[in-house]
């Protein structure tokens, strides 16, 4: 019969596997065996590719077999090159993080992803074949000699690919070949629990913004329907040469307008000090819509440079099939430039084709789907555990009865 402690131990193992099975530790070392980069995270990849019958989506995870590609990774050389972490998996897949630093901070300046369209496991019936690559800057950054920590999902949009890092712990330019105990928390997590701003200062992260409904109408009717809450993260240098990051909520009192055209739908939100443009586009076959550009013009009265202009025209966020609506309850963080990023909360949006001023069929974001998988997986594990304990009990009972048989 099973030992009394076995079911409890089995349950702990099952839950531990569910919580940490997807994460992996990647370490880059110099020629002396000293670690200079450490990264621990799980990753998922959302890719749009073309087939003979239009666009298709492919979603896959960073496998447990992924490992550091030492030939492409490096600790860098001072004043010559910067540290690089390259992770290899599958047949030709590469995820590369290029680091850089200044006097006070280090960052992942660029993320590069190479994928293999000849891999039929992930890209069935792809029109194009071979290795393709995309890259983008990121807002992964931390103070020197501190660990970058982010419990929230980090999304990096790279053209037709979105890379999502989860439960990330990253540090480059290591001092003692290990993660620092001091952390810099990502903006998605909010301020660090140990960070207490001076009492006269307003909090760095305000309450969540209000969900606002937007409607853009053209000559042929409604071309954009949206319900979402928006928050702008602005980093700038004040007149006293102090660098600050502020989170500013879009208010229901701000003026909203927009325009419709066959290939671009624009939503403009204007306040006293800022003009925010969100531009939606379509893919080549006009089967998908997505947020392709975010542009901000802002006046900053207390800044060294009083005006801020930021734009990114190569985004691929908030994407769904034309005629359907994109919906995501999870907060999304859209990186625009190193000075500006946009947080989107509780979003539902539909562009180009809107029937009867109502949202079409819903396409949920990957993050919401992942959140549902955890309770389902835990429930499945517990059900399996109950079955195992029941079988062990019945086997033990049968053996006990066998011991009393007449000889």
Swiss-Prot record:
Topological category with respect to the lipid bilayer: Single-pass type I membrane protein
Gene Ontology MF annotations: ion channel inhibitor activity
Listed InterPro entries: Lamp2-like_luminal, Lamp2-like_TM, LAMP_CS, Lysosome-assoc_membr_glycop
PTM comment text: O- and N-glycosylated; some of the N-glycans attached to LAMP-1 are polylactosaminoglycans.
Signal sequence extent: 1-21
Region (Disordered): 183-206
PROSITE patterns linked to this entry: LAMP_1, LAMP_2, LAMP_3
Xref: CDD domains: TM_EGFR-like (cd12087)
GO biological process, one term: establishment of protein localization to organelle
Cystine pairs: 36-75, 150-186, 223-260, 328-365
Segments for region (Second lumenal domain): 220-371
Lumenal side: 22-371
Glycan attachment residues as annotated in the record: 32, 40, 57, 72, 79, 98, 102, 116, 125, 145, 160, 178, 215, 220, 233, 241, 253, 283, 297, 304, 312
UniProt entry tagged with the keyword Iron-sulfur: no
Pro residues composition bias: residue spans: 194-206
Region named First lumenal domain: 22-189
Chief subcellular location: membrane
Annotated family: Belongs to the LAMP family.
Subunit relationships: Interacts with ABCB9; this interaction strongly stabilizes ABCB9 and protects ABCB9 against lysosomal degradation. Interacts with FURIN. Interacts with TMEM175; inhibiting the proton channel activity of TMEM175.
Function, as annotated: Lysosomal membrane glycoprotein which plays an important role in lysosome biogenesis, lysosomal pH regulation, autophagy and cholesterol homeostasis. Acts as an important regulator of lysosomal lumen pH regulation by acting as a direct inhibitor of the proton channel TMEM175, facilitating lysosomal acidification for optimal hydrolase activity. Also plays an important role in NK-cells cytotoxicity. Mechanistically, participates in cytotoxic granule movement to the cell surface and perforin trafficking to the lytic granule.
Protein name, UniProt field: Lysosome-associated membrane glycoprotein 1
